[in-house]
From Swiss-Prot:
It catalyses: (2R,3S)-3-isopropylmalate = (2S)-2-isopropylmalate. PANTHER family: 3-ISOPROPYLMALATE DEHYDRATASE, HOMOACONITASE, MITOCHONDRIAL-RELATED. Belongs to the aconitase/IPM isomerase family. LeuC type 1 subfamily. Its EC number is 4.2.1.33. Catalyzes the isomerization between 2-isopropylmalate and 3-isopropylmalate, via the formation of 2-isopropylmaleate. GO terms for biological process: L-leucine biosynthetic process. It comes from Actinobacillus succinogenes (strain ATCC 55618 / DSM 22257 / CCUG 43843 / 130Z). Heterodimer of LeuC and LeuD. This is 3-isopropylmalate dehydratase large subunit. It is an enzyme of class 4 (lyase). The keyword Metal-binding applies. It comes from the Bacteria. HAMAP family: LeuC_type1. Binds 1 [4Fe-4S] cluster per subunit. The lineage of its organism: Bacteria, Pseudomonadati, Pseudomonadota, Gammaproteobacteria, Pasteurellales.
Length: 469
């Protein structure tokens, strides 16, 4: 019987598998940041252990840093401690660190791919739940906890049980104005936030193949949001073109040999999947979440669902609780709902393609009066540099947005960028949980174009009706 891409990747990295025990996997790439690594390094010191393979671990600063200042001395509290600790630990062990003073610094899941650290066929781990992003390259990538970070630093291996296999096929082509974010939100809406639990999911179909690498990263980034362990897309010419000449990508004959191997990284025709989900691309409309998990999502031309019409008691109770928190009534048209803030950024949507899409909407327009703040936060120093070369920063600033430095920013309430209590935000991030963007903040997940439209019109609008300047 044939193998799935996941099975091929997993089996290729098994170091040891005793009968009846969890397999031990070799880890090709370990990415670290300032939040989940300090305790791991402390554990190494206490145990008297060294970092086993320094050249396979890379660090960056992203979660708790300020997007306004680049000087560690101007940081405060926990953020300053975490940044200084990461710098100290990387210097002590020889780990390469992309710190705040380099243009290579960025959100870990933006920095890794653009540096060529993310390659097809690899196993990649990071102390961050959205490590699945790297699966867009045909790599087996997943988030790990701090104790596992320590284990990988010490051994370059990790115990990992086999997951089930899931295939999500998006057939045909999407309509104009529909983005990768809309595709993945539609998938989560269909599967629910737990639909992929216990699985590694492979995304396929014409609509997935049509996506750029930036779009594929957006899709895999949110695999975790429907419960999957990891997300995968088989590598192809789009992948190879993106990676060619990246700093850490193979060169010369090594590149040719790598391409030959990478072309084998696909599911066999007779591979068996435990779960199969199919969507028709033509049916996908611009998506907006209405509740407090990414599975509570509708198309912009639909009304907020009525919990009274839900037959499952758990789903009904969850919807009632979500609507109470989010401050909406059943059967509300989201196009009538004003927003207080807009956030364009995060490891989901802060790449150059995302910023171009937002700028196309905001060009020649101004922030709506009712919108208190619009944050545009590039995913890395290189994205920022490219955006400024193209003049995108000037478009954002002219529209009344704030153009910031790279970082995780308002995706999570761990730094200075937060919502005020009960403020409503159109956000390009990946989670709309209660309090995710700040105490009692209300988050609606959308694509960059939809977020930009909310910024200039002051409410949610159907991007398909907006003329681009």
């Amino acid at each position: 019987m044939g193998k799935t891409l996941y099975q091929k990747l997993f089996d290729a990295h098994v170091v040891y598998e005793a009968e009846g025990e969890t397999p031990i996997l070799y880890i090709n790439r370990h990415l670290i940041h300032e939040v989940t690594s300090p305790q791991a390094f402390d554990g190494l010191r206490v145990a008297g252990r060294q970092v086993r393979q320094v050249n396979k671990t890379f660090g960056t600063m992203d979660h708790s840093i300020s997007t306004q200042v680049r000087d560690v001395n101007l940081l405060e509290g926990q953020a300053k401690i975490q940044v200084l600790e990461l710098d100290k630990n990387c210097k002590a062990t020889g780990i390469e660190l992309f710190d705040m003073n380099t243009k290579q610094q960025g959100i870990v899941h933006v920095m890794g791919p653009e540096q060529g650290l993310t390659l097809p066929g690899m196993t990649i781990v990071c102390g961050d739940s959205h490590t699945a992003t790297h699966g867009a390259f045909g790599a087996l990538a997943f988030g790990i906890g701090t104790s596992e970070v320590e284990h990988v630093l010490a051994t370059q291996t990790l115990k990992q049980a086999r997951a089930k296999n899931m295939k999500v096929e998006v057939r045909g082509k999407v309509n104009p104005g529909i983005t990768a974010k809309d595709i993945v939100l539609a998938i989560i809406g269909k599967t629910t936030m737990a639909g992929g639990t216990g699985h590694v999911v492979e995304f396929c179909g014409e609509a997935i193949r049509d996506l750029s690498m930036e779009g594929r990263m957006t899709v895999c980034n949110m695999a975790i949001e429907f419960g999957a362990k990891a997300g995968l897309i088989a590598p192809d010419e789009t992948t190879f073109e993106y990676l060619k000449d990246r700093p850490h990508a193979p060169k010369g004959k090594d590149w040719d040999d790598a391409i030959e191997y990478w072309k084998t990284l696909k599911s066999d025709d007779d591979a068996q999947f435990d779960t199969v989900v199919v969507l028709e691309a033509k049916d996908i409309a611009p998506q907006v979440t209405w509740g407090t998990n990414p599975g509570q999502v509708i198309a912009i031309d639909q009304l907020v669902p009525n919990p009274a019409e839900m037959s499952d008691p758990v789903t009904k109770t969850s919807a009632e609780k979500a609507l109470a928190y989010i401050g909406l009534q059943a059967n509300t048209d989201l196009k009538d709902v004003p927003v207080d803030q807009v956030f364009i950024g995060s490891c989901t949507n802060s790449r150059i393609e995302d910023l171009r899409a937002a700028a196309a909407v905001m060009k020649g327009r101004k922030k709506a009066d009712n919108v208190k703040r619009v944050l545009v936060v590039p995913g890395s120093g290189l994205v920022k540099e490219q955006a400024e070369k193209e003049g995108l920063d000037k478009i954002f600033i002219a529209a009344g947005a704030e153009w910031r430095n790279p970082g995780c920013s308002m995706c999570l309430g761990m730094n200075d960028d937060r919502l005020g209590e009960w403020e409503r935000c159109a956000s390009t991030s990946n989670r709309n949980f209660e309090g995710r963007q700040g105490r009692n903040g209300r988050t609606h997940l959308v694509s960059p174009a939809m977020a930009a439209a909310a910024a200039v019109f002051g409410k949610f609008v159907d991007i398909r009706t907006i003329k681009l300047n």
